Amino acid sequence: MATAAVERCKRKLPDRLAIVRADRSQRQFARDLGVFQQNVNRYESGTTPHTDFLITLALKEQISIDWLLLGKGRMRRSR
């Protein structure tokens, strides 16, 4: 994947995180995931999330990694 395409995907990740969080506060979202609220804040502000966070998010929230990272397909994984 070209560098420009990677950067575009990275720029859109904070927006997708906010979509997953929905109407929950960052504090509640962090609690639901078992992570620190400061990390959620940093990731929604544009810091690249750690792999562990992304995996936890995908598993606990039933989120498609393709959608989360690339914006492709449906947000929710099939059960």
Descriptions of predicted regions:
Residues 1-24, 32:
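A short, Lys/Arg-rich alpha-helix, primarily the initiator
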Residues 23, 46, 74:
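Alpha-helical DNA-recognition elements
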Residues 67-79:
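Short amphipathic recognition helices of helix-turn-helix/homeodomain-type DNA-binding modules
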Residues 52-67:
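DNA major-groove recognition helix of helix-turn-helix/homeodomain DNA-binding modules
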Residues 22-42:
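Short alpha-helical DNA-recognition segment
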Residues 44, 61, 72:
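DNA major-groove recognition helix of helix-turn-helix
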